[in-house]
Amino acid sequence: MVREASIVAVVGWKNSGKTGLVERLVGESVRRGLRVSTAKHAHHAVDIDQPGRDSWRHREAGAHEVALVSASRFVLQRELRGRAEPSLLEVAATLESVDLLIAEGFKSSPVAKIEAWRDACDRPPLASKDDTVFALAVEGGSSTLSRHHPRLAERLPVFELGDAEGILTAVVNHLKP
């Protein structure tokens, strides 16, 4: 089970750099000796199985959960079958304990958030209406954000989108009890 105090979500509009930022944060976390997990929210149906495979057949037969296990990987698929999509906190409760859970997406979750933002997204930062965003990772850094959203640039820490070291330090400091 992952404690809520060790969860950060990377949020932002489509093509804002979220996935690349998560990759860099995971790499920097591992470099620092942290044990890290990730959770990714998908806006489309997810199926990692292949039609006709044994695990697919188990699921099609009605299994609630299907565990696929090998010497190098363990995958658990849970069928919702009409139940509500689990929240990030519900997902975190099912994961092994780690130093940090980095989520991609989950904009409506009540956890601490870093926003990835590019002015090419042509949308205002989510941070302008979301108090759980505690910092921004911006392509072009604070000068870019200051040109477009000066109040936000004054109110929140702003990092260059590629500055995984600085962003992770901010995350760790923000999540400290």
Model region roles, listed by residue range:
Residues 5, 16-20, 24, 53, ...:
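Conserved active-site and cofactor/substrate-binding residues in soluble primary-metabolism enzymes
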Residues 13, 41-42, 51, 70-71, ...:
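Fold-independent oxyanion-binding glycine-rich loops
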Residues 100-176:
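Phosphate/Mg2+-binding loops and adjacent switch elements
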Residues 1-44, 148:
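Walker A (P-loop) phosphate-binding motif
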Residues 3-4, 62, 95-97, 129-130:
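Short loop/turn elements that form and flank the Walker-type P-loop nucleotide-binding site
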Residues 79-108:
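Phosphate-binding/switch loop-helix module in NTP-utilizing enzymes
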Residues 3-5, 25-29, 91-95, 159, ...:
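P-loop NTP-binding site
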Residues 24-89:
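N-terminal phosphate/diphosphate-binding loop that engages ATP/GTP or pyrophosphate donors
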